[in-house]
Amino acid sequence: YKYVMEAPSMYFAPVYPNINREDHTIFGNKSGGPIGSGGFSIYRNPYASMVQGSSKQSAYTINTAFELEQKLDFLTKGLNFKALVSFKNWSKTTVNRSFSPYFYELQNPQEQEDGSYLYDYNSISKGRTALETSTSTTGDRLMNLQATLNYQRMFGDKHDVGAMLVYLQREYNLNNPDNNYYNTLPERNQGLAGRVTYAYDGRYLAEFNFGYNGSENFEKGSRYGFFPSLAVGYLISNEKFFEPLTKVISNLKIRASYGLVGNADIGSNRFPYLTKVDLGGAGFVFGDQWQTSSNGATITTYGAEKVTWEIGKKYNVGFDLGLFNKLSLNVDFFREDRKDIFLRRNTIPAESGITGDLRPYGNLGKVRNQGVDMSLDYNHAVSKDFMISAKGTFTYAKNQYMEIDEPDYEYAYMSQVGRPLNQYKGYIALGLFKDQEEIDNSPKQILTGVVQPGDIK
């Protein structure tokens, strides 16, 4: 539809009558347009663009999953094992068929006595009637393996113990990789996760988690990271001394947690520890042969040694409050200190020649994010057939750079340290210049040319 606005509708008709009995459709057009075609500058004909071809896509997805579950009570009560293998294969084929329109420009139209027109047209862009066909195929394969050992058991009336151990493995492949060597290699991830929980008499709660995860994007010795966490809670409303208050305060729980989380998502920058070399480099000059250039290998990106996981330290303190079994308030105060953030280096001198994409990556940044999360729920059953429910949420968060790889700026205000992420920077307007005297007595204005009264100061 955007082509409709490219040329006035009176410039040409979508098609003209085939008065010369051509073996193709006579699409209208006009010379002098913004598009080059066959030695002419023409306009787009929206109707021709609409009918000149078609595209057909066929997509197929195969999902397969095998699951095995076995209770192991014969070893110890409450123990069970589960294994899951899943496979997905997706493919899409696109077939495009089109022809190149013949465009003609109207010549010498003459109105006749009966109101009709006598005219001719001139070819300004030759096309082809034969259909041109192109086909493309894309797709991917994903395989997941998960094995889980789970344990849950109650000892006596008060001790509730649980444990879980999970092994994860993932492999992702492209069915039709391009000429990029990295895209021909499978993407693989592997990890082991565990959890231990304990609850005493429904009042005192504790949970320990860990993750031992591996990513192929890092070199040997840096591929695996260990990320533990610990959480505790106290359900005060289950205490005996709290029973007189339960008609009003139906639930009261306080909780706290601390843990480490890892991030290996570095976008499309696979294997950043490898230096990338292009064997088809050109334009090299040696010695005094400055008029002669040679071909050879060139480095496109320098590898980064010892690049590893981003690590975030998370702190959380909160409480849950329930009133009259109808109103629920959840409040969480949180803070995350993230370090070893994956960034390109910005402090390499330009004189070294290592600029732009040549710059290596590194674990360079530190960021702090903190704030509060709140949610309020109201549920009231008016009758067995009618219920009133409402929910509201509130979040306040503030982040800032604690450390970042940046030049040693002359002025402190130019640094990003202590400032929010992605903060906009700009000049602060001090008002408008009133007269020429004020302009003459002000610092030089570098954003405009000649400054006049009324301009922004």
Model-derived features with residue positions:
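Alpha-helix N-cap recognition
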Residues: D435-E438, P453
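Extracytoplasmic gating/loop element in the C-terminal half of outer-membrane beta-barrel translocons
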Residues: Y47, Q423, L447-T448, Q452-D455
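Extracellular/periplasmic, surface-exposed regions of secreted and cell-surface proteins
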Residues: Y1-S98, L106-I428
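Intrinsically disordered, low-complexity terminal/linker regions enriched in Pro/Ser/Gly
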Residues: Y427-G431, Q436
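Glycine-rich N-terminal loop/short-helix segment of MobA-like nucleotidyltransferase
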Residues: N295, N330, E438-L447
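Long C-terminal tail modules that include membrane-anchoring/sorting signals and adjacent low-complexity
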Residues: Y411, P443, Q452-K457
